[in-house]
Regions:
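Alpha-helical structural elements
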Residues: 1-3, 14, 45, 58, ...
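General N-terminal targeting signals
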Residues: 25-27, 36, 43, 50, ...
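Short beta-strand element of the conserved SAM-dependent methyltransferase core
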Residues: 8-11, 48-52, 70
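Short, intrinsically disordered low-complexity segments
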Residues: 40-60
């Protein structure tokens, strides 16, 4: 089975503030989500994973790519066409 992934570019530079804002929006607007422990890479990059009934949501604060972005198996209309 192929799972569609929605990608949302939030910030063109890595940013703890933008990363925290995205996580806050997801946590406040999504119902019945489970937050996993945050993953931190050796370069300081962070990944926050959320589980929902419809699929996973992954929020990245990626210092190697230098961006904040979301890859999600769930369509997140709150991020379509806008950035934080």
């Amino acid at each position: 089975m192929i799972t569609k992934v929605f990608s949302y570019n939030i910030s063109k530079t890595a940013s703890s503030k933008a990363f925290k804002n995205v996580c806050s929006v997801i946590e406040s607007k999504m119902e019945e989500i489970q937050k996993e422990d945050m993953l931190t890479d050796c370069d300081g990059s962070q990944i926050q994973i959320y589980n929902t009934k419809k699929g996973k949501i992954k929020v990245y604060n990626d210092y190697e790519v230098d961006a904040v972005y979301v890859d999600s198996e769930v369509e997140l209309k709150m991020f379509s066409g806008s950035s934080l």
